């Protein structure tokens, strides 16, 4: 459904998450200089969507949905639960220019923890190799699931309205999609 308007921040989040509507840099520049953008169709002559600082709050809590199917989920299971382990892990990955997206940490048993994250599929093998070198001798297990898809739901106020997550999870359930990781931000 076409929106009459959307905020810079919502459009920037959609662009960053893979919506192929506007380049995220163009939205950043428009926001920086307070320039309204109008996204138009090249196929039909109709009013487009205005990207601006403050959007008229329509009744829709969900402003957009994106998908990224070029994703790998990597998990390190059973790593020692000591200060600095996450720093070491993500520093090694950053040194190899591997961009990390969603991060999930859970406390394991017997003084261990598990960390899972997503990255581009093209970096999965290198990331696994780095992590096996780093944690393999400590008894941790590194796993990689690819391909996986990341679905992002964008909207202002989603956390303050009960039932929004339930509806989204219900739609995934109806489509037969199993959820591997969940992350929220607002």
What residue ranges belong to the model's regions?
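C-terminal catalytic "cap/lid" subdomain
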Residues: 1-185
């Amino acid at each position: 459904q076409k929106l009459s308007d959307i905020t810079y921040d919502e459009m920037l989040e959609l662009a960053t998450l893979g919506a192929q509507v506007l380049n995220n840099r163009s939205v950043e520049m428009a926001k920086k200089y307070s320039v309204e953008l109008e996204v138009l169709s090249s196929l039909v002559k109709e009013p487009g969507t205005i990207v601006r600082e403050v959007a008229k709050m329509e009744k829709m809590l969900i402003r957009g949905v994106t998908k990224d199917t070029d994703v790998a989920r990597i998990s390190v299971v059973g790593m020692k639960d000591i200060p600095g382990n996450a720093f070491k892990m993500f520093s090694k990955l950053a040194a190899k220019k591997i961009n990390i997206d969603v991060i999930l940490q859970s406390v394991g048993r017997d003084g261990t923890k598990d960390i899972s994250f997503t990255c581009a599929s093209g970096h999965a093998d290198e990331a696994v190799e780095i992590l096996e070198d780093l944690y393999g001798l400590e008894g941790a297990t590194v796993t990689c699931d690819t391909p996986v898809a990341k679905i992002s739901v964008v909207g202002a106020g989603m956390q303050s309205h009960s039932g929004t997550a339930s509806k989204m999870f219900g739609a995934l359930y109806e489509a037969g999609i199993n959820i591997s990781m969940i992350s929220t931000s607002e």
